[in-house]
Amino acid sequence: MLFRSMGKAGQIAMNIATTFCSTGIPSVFLHPSEAQHGDLGILQKNDLLLLISNSGKTREIVELTRLAHNLDPDLKFIVITGNPDSPLAQESDVCLSTGKPAEVCTLGMTPTTSTTAMTVIGDILVVQTMKKTQFTIEEYSKRHHGGYLGEKSRSLCEK
């Protein structure tokens, strides 16, 4: 899976990508500007793009959908957005709407509530994929060598 996004949504995309990696699904975050300068070559047949944009209008992300389709016309897109009528949503194979929640910051602009919704949707995708692939604690422990999660997962395997 390849993840692309900008700004605060980009940080959410990075988190979702690393969570997929730790649960057995090879994933990478690709910054849209780097993709336009050759890194789009990471795309392979049967890859899936997950794009995140609250507005669904982020120029760099919309441009990337066209560039990626030029590279592989069969490439599938999932979009997480607060605007299911946006250009990005229209390009997607699957649109997952955040419901366009009002931002809780005093200005109503800083990504707060929207990024929380994006994170929740990403976590749901990870958990459902883990169920579908029947990802086990043994597989988890092989990917988590350090820290508390590594220690805990290894101890669960020993039982």
In which residue ranges do the predicted regions lie?
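Glycine-rich phosphate-binding loops that contact phosphosugars or nucleotide phosphates
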Residues: 6-133
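Internal, active-site/partner-interface "lid" segment
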Residues: 87-90, 104, 131-159
